[in-house]
Each structure stands twice: as C-alpha cells, then as structure tokens.
C-alpha cells in the first residue's frame, strides 16, 4: 500500500502522554519522509523519534498572547526542528515539572478560566514562515488532535489554507468539560461548541477513542466516528508477560501513569483500602505509585511507595513484576463527564501484560462496561473504600480468580488491540480519503 504524506497538527509523538503514545503506535512503520508535525513548544518534549523526526515549532511568529500575558511567556523561535534520538525515543521518560509550571497549570490557568479569560488570551495564527514551510512540505492529508480552543481554531485555519482532506481524532470527551467554571462558562461553552462543529464539518474522517464515544457523538453531533484506540505490539509485551499467579511475601499493586483530571482521589482511596486489607492479611500488600509527581498524601500511608516513571521499553517487565495493576477513575461529576467515553492508553497495555487488573471506576464509563462484559478485571463500581478493600482481599485469596481475569484480559487485548491489524485498518482509512 502506497502511504500518503501526512501533516499532523497539535500532537507530537511521545511516550509519556496518551495522545502521543497512540499516535506513535498508529503511525509506526510509516515512511519518515512522509510524516511531519506542527505543535506548540509547551508539548514539545520527551519526543519519540522512531516514527517522526520532523517538527515545526509554533513560536512567537504564530503563537500570540494578549497584553499583558505576552510578557509572561518565554520567547520561542518559530520554525522547523529536526529531532535526534537524544532525549527522544531512547529516553522517553517524562521531564521534571518545574515549580513555575505547577503554579501556572494548577492555579494561574484555572483562575483565568474562572474569570472568563483563559480561552481568549492566546491564539495560533498562520505566519508567512509557517505557510512557506507547509507549501514546501506539501502534505496529502492532515491528521489533527485538539483539546483546547486555540488548537481547535488553528485546525480550522490550517485546513482552510492547505485545502487537503483532514482527519480529526478525539482522545477524550474534553468538549463536555472545557468550560465548566465561572460566570462566562455558558458563553465559552457555546462558542467552543460552534468551533468544534465547524472542525467536524470540515473533516473528511472523524475518529473516536472508543465505541461508546462514537455512539454518543453520533447522537450529539450527528456525525459518524470510526473507533481507533491505542494498538499494542504483542511481541513487545510478551517479552515479559506474566504467567505465574502465585503471590510472594509482599504482594504489590501498581499504578503507573498520570495524575490529573479524572484520576486523583481514587489513588488515595486505594491506599486507604490497602490499610484495611492489611489488618487481616499475614503478608501485607504494598501500593506502588509510578507517577511523574509524588502526591502530598503518600507519606500518610506506610503501604505506599512512590517511584519515578521508567522508560517505555521497561514497562513490560515492570507490569509483569507487579502482582496487580490498578486502573482507577474518579467518581466526581466533572471527572465522569471527562472520562465517560475514554479508553485510557494504558488499558490494553495492562491487559496484555498478564497481570491481574483491579478497576475502581464509575459504572457508566466505557472502560467499566467493556471490562465487565469481557470479565478481564476485578471491578468495583461503587465509591466505597470498604468494598474496594473487600475486592482486593478476594483477589489476594483466590489464585483462580487472578488467573481467570488475567487470561481473559490477554486474550481480548490480542484480539482487539493487535497493532498489525489496527494499523492496517488505520492506513486503509487514510489512504482511502486521499484517493477520493
């Protein structure tokens, strides 16, 4: 199959964010000369260069901030960057988040959102330099992701200029939560909804992250979405796939990934549940948190140990060495709106690892529905620490149940998320719209 030249908007290839991991796995094996990315400097880090090494960084010539916020931004040079392996595919561990970044992301931006300024203080334009670069690259097709207003509007601008078919891929239901606070929330919700619908109208193909999302978006937007979730390299994960379900003297439950919207409170709930379980068990259970930042509550619990993120290449071994993998979603209304139709990138990776999965999440989420249907996880759908503790205890005491849910998970992952099958279907979709 002859593969077209693709221009990717607003999402780099990386191994520390779901959108980047999914992107890398979907486009793996593509000719590097036929892939380029346009993105802001804010997400230009921890790059995976195995698939793509050509980037245009949206700097001060395109990324414009209103006064006085323009004085608070670092000066970034616009233009093409050729990325080497250093700091990319060979070292994809997340960079240390600075105190400045924490303050800006956790306090400053939420404050701006509340007072109604966040969605209007910056925009991305098409500079003469960027247009020239796009003309020289001359893509056949556009692939885009967006999660904030400025990137959404930029997708419209880019499609209008390039005049080539566009594929728009939605990773989670951010349209439902992008404007939920402050006196101007209705204004921004309606405005962004209109801009999103314009992007959907301009797109030749629409992609969702789950079947549940595709069904919901058909009702909400009247559009047909095809589902493409993160595929997995079966052989890569089989290199350390767990096949022994006996427990050691200190059983471990591992959570590896991000802490943020939709995944916060349930992590501490797990620590509290383990404290309850350990009162009844001879061999205490330990909770390993492998995250970028150490939560403030960790030191309150003797059962919890925080570890830094590891290179992506080490994950099969790390997952297989754990006795259980924890897959949580928070139960707040805001969290449910955000994650209801999502399928976390780590889900198929957890599944194929062979390690039993404990899921603590609302019953209405796509993730829980699929897990219950396939019986590939021990699922707790009530926001109850005692019930979570009871589920943990049941799994610790039942090797048969541990083995059954783990084998189900492996089988379904190999059938549904096999990268060879998913990638071939993805290529057919892209090649098909270029030929039209």
Each model region followed by its residue ranges:
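Conserved nucleotide-sugar donor-binding subdomain of glycosyltransferases
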Residues: 78-141
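Carbohydrate-associated surface elements
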Residues: 212, 230-231
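A charged, aromatic-enriched C-terminal amphipathic alpha-helix characteristic of glycosyltransferases
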Residues: 383, 387, 397-430
């Amino acid at each position: 199959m002859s593969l077209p030249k693709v221009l990717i908007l607003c999402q780099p290839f990386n191994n520390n964010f779901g959108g980047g991991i999914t992107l890398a796995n979907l486009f793996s094996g593509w000719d590097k000369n036929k892939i380029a990315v346009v993105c802001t400097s804010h997400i230009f880090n921890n790059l995976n260069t195995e698939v793509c090494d050509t980037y245009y960084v949206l700097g001060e010539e395109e990324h414009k901030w209103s006064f006085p916020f323009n004085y608070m931004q670092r000066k970034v040079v616009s233009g093409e960057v050729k990325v080497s392996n250093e700091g990319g595919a060979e070292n994809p561990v997340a960079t240390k988040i600075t105190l400045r970044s924490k303050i800006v992301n956790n306090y400053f931006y939420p404050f701006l959102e509340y007072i109604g300024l966040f969605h209007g203080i910056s925009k991305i334009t098409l500079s003469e330099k960027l247009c020239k670069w796009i003309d020289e690259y001359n893509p056949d097709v556009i692939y885009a992701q967006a999660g904030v207003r400025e990137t959404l509007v930029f997708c419209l601008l880019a499609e209008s200029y390039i005049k080539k078919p566009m594929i728009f891929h939605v990773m989670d239901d951010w349209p439902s939560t992008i404007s939920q606070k402050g006196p101007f929330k209705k204004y921004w919700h309606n405005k962004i909804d209109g801009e999103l619908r314009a992007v959907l109208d301009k797109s030749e193909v629409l992609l969702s992250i789950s079947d549940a999302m595709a069904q919901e978006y058909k009702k909400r937007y009247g559009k047909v979405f095809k589902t493409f979730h993160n595929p997995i390299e079966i052989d890569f994960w089989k290199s350390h796939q767990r096949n022994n379900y006996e427990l050691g003297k200190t059983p471990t439950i591992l959570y590896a990934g991000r802490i943020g919207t939709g995944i916060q409170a349930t992590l501490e709930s797990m620590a509290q549940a383990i404290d309850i379980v350990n009162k009844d068990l001879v061999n205490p259970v330990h909770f390993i948190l492998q995250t970028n930042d150490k939560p403030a509550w960790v030191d309150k619990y003797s059962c919890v140990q925080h570890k830094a993120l590891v290179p992506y290449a080490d994950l099969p071994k790390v997952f297989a060495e754990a006795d259980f993998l924890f897959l949580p979603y928070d139960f707040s209304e805001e969290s449910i709106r955000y994650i209801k139709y999502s399928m976390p990138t780590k889900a198929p990776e957890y599944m194929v690892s062979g390690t039993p999965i404990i899921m603590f999440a609302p019953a209405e989420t796509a993730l829980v529905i699929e897990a219950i249907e396939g019986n590939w996880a021990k699922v707790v759908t009530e926001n109850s620490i005692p019930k979570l503790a009871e589920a943990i205890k049941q799994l610790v005491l039942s090797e048969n149940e541990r083995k059954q849910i783990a084998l189900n998970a492996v089988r379904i992952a190999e059938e549904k998320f096999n990268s060879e099958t998913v990638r071939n279907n993805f290529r057919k979709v892209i090649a098909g719209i270029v030929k039209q």
